[in-house]
């Protein structure tokens, strides 16, 4: 081995978790011609919004009896309008097999709630000289337990929960999140990119904690010596720090 050859012990890469914004195209029926026309109309509203946008093709909501999807043809239609397919979401065997045949990643069917994505018409033409002053909104305070399946969002401010948060519950805030009870669900602070946001938990047993898109899941959190303790979570660079309160 030459002296210039790197040692095996020296890492050449690092795997990091990050929550990325990816458009999901949920196909309602198997009609590529109609899709081509409707996509053209949508893209015409804001071309740069869709240009080279990463895309997941969701085929798992297609009604029964729609027939076999021409997956390469579907991808060509999307690509012609600037959308780059990263993966498909599917449950039918034929769709999964078609994706595997062209080495396209397959995601499991989603149970999460997704909202329609609508570009702002004329957003490229109107560029304000300076960003508007942020609107300060009061802290959102929840006094009752947050049950599994519930989602609570504090838009423009902090979220305070003076009770427990069950597994499957989701807390979101543009600012900080405070939980004065067992935290067993998901807590996502600074969801619009505020890297100074923090999460405060009286008892950290969460499924996921996230600040400004950087996150740790329960498998990572359980290995932390402060699992189950009273902690705060902050972000330093792209690293989440867990500190005892």
Curated annotation (Swiss-Prot):
Disulfide topology? none
Question: Is the keyword Lyase assigned to this protein?
Answer: no
Give the compositionally biased regions (Basic and acidic residues): 113-132
* GO terms of biological process kind: cell morphogenesis; division septum assembly; regulation of cell division; regulation of cell septum assembly
Q: Where is this region: Disordered?
A: 113-138
Q: Which key words are in the record?
A: Cell cycle, Cell division, Septation
Q: Which domain of life is it from?
A: Bacteria
Q: Does the keyword rRNA-binding apply?
A: no
- InterPro entries according to UniProt: CAP/MinC_C, MinC, MinC_C_sf, MinC_N, Septum_form_inhib_MinC_C
Enumerate the Gene3D superfamilies for this protein: 2.160.20.70, 3.30.70.260
Spell out the NCBIfam families in the cross-references: minC
- Record-stated family: Belongs to the MinC family.
Role, per record: Cell division inhibitor that blocks the formation of polar Z ring septums. Rapidly oscillates between the poles of the cell to destabilize FtsZ filaments that have formed before they mature into polar Z rings. Prevents FtsZ polymerization.
Q: Subunit structure, per the record?
A: Interacts with MinD and FtsZ.
Matching HAMAP family, A to Z? MinC
Q: Return the protein name.
A: Probable septum site-determining protein MinC
The record lists the organism as Pseudomonas fluorescens (strain SBW25)
């Amino acid at each position: 081995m030459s002296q210039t050859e790197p040692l095996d012990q020296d890492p050449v890469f690092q795997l990091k978790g990050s929550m990325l914004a990816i458009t999901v195209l949920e196909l309602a029926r198997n009609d590529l011609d109609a899709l081509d026309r409707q996509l053209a109309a949508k893209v015409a509203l804001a071309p740069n919004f869709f240009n080279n946008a990463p895309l997941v093709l969701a085929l798992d909501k297609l009604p029964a009896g729609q027939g076999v999807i021409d997956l390469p043809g579907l991808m060509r239609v999307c690509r012609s309008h600037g959308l780059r397919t990263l993966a498909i979401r599917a449950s039918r065997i034929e769709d999964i097999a078609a994706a595997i045949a062209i080495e396209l990643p397959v995601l499991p069917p989603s149970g999460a709630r997704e909202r329609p994505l609508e570009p702002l018409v004329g957003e490229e033409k109107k560029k304000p000289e300076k960003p508007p002053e942020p609107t300060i909104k009061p802290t959102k305070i929840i006094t009752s337990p947050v049950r599994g399946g519930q989602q609570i969002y504090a838009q423009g401010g902090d979220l305070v929960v003076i009770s427990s948060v069950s597994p499957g519950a989701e807390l979101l805030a543009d600012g900080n999140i405070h939980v004065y009870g067992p935290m067993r669900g998901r807590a996502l602070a600074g969801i619009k990119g505020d890297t100074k946001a923090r999460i405060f938990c009286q008892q950290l047993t969460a499924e996921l904690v996230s600040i400004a898109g950087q996150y740790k899941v329960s498998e990572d959190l359980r290995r932390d010596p402060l699992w189950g303790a009273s902690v705060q979570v902050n972000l330093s660079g792209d690293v989440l720090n867990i500190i005892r309160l």
